[in-house]
Amino acid sequence: GWAGSLGPVDVDLGVLQFLYPGDNAAGAAEADATELYVGVAKDFGIASASIYYYNVVSTDAWGFADADGSEYWTLDVDVPVGDTPITASFHVGNQEFEGSGNEPYDYTDWKVNLDYALSDTYSAGIYYTDTDMTEDIWTVQGEFLGQDSVGAYLSASF
């Protein structure tokens, strides 16, 4: 991929390849997938925002047949909370599957996150995430994949 600045915005372009080892179940669509993506980001001072677009270019993807052209959009906004080490982050994404019979699997996801910078290297946070996935479609082996969740984390970046 490539990332850089074009005028007042940061741009990110690339290819993502998802490879899943092992054989597919008999008659199942390929799980491996290839996506092209483009993203733009801007820091507005009081907040920063990014928009990303992902497009599947492989025939099958993640077990969905004829998924070529499936799209995922994201919008992310980060808002520093005053002069504190806290940042509030908001995410919304929308997945639309191409292919005959794949439309019922379309969904929107969202996340709200509070991050506390402990230092230049470490941060801790909490988040809430959810989707509008349909439970009868997105339940696999008794587990609903679109279940809302609350979590906490400790992160290090260097």
Report the location of each language-model feature.
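Surface-exposed loop and membrane-interface regions of Gram-negative outer-membrane beta-barrel proteins
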Residues: G1-D32, P104, Q141-G142
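Residue-level signature of outer-membrane beta-barrel architecture
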Residues: W2-L6, Q17, V40-K42, V77-V81, ...
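Repeated loop/turn-to-beta-strand initiation elements of outer-membrane beta-barrel proteins
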Residues: L6-L13, F44-I51, D83-S89, D120-I126
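Residues that define the transmembrane beta-barrel architecture of outer-membrane proteins
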Residues: V9, E30-L36, A67-W73, D106-W110, ...
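Membrane-embedded beta-strands of outer-membrane beta-barrel proteins
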Residues: L13, L36-V38, L75-V77, V112, ...
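Sequence/structural signature of outer-membrane beta-barrel proteins
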Residues: L16-A25, Y54-G63, G93-G101, D109, ...
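Hydrophobic, well-structured mid-protein blocks that either form specific transmembrane helices
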Residues: L16-W73
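Outer-membrane beta-barrel "beta-signal"
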Residues: V112, Y116, E143-F158
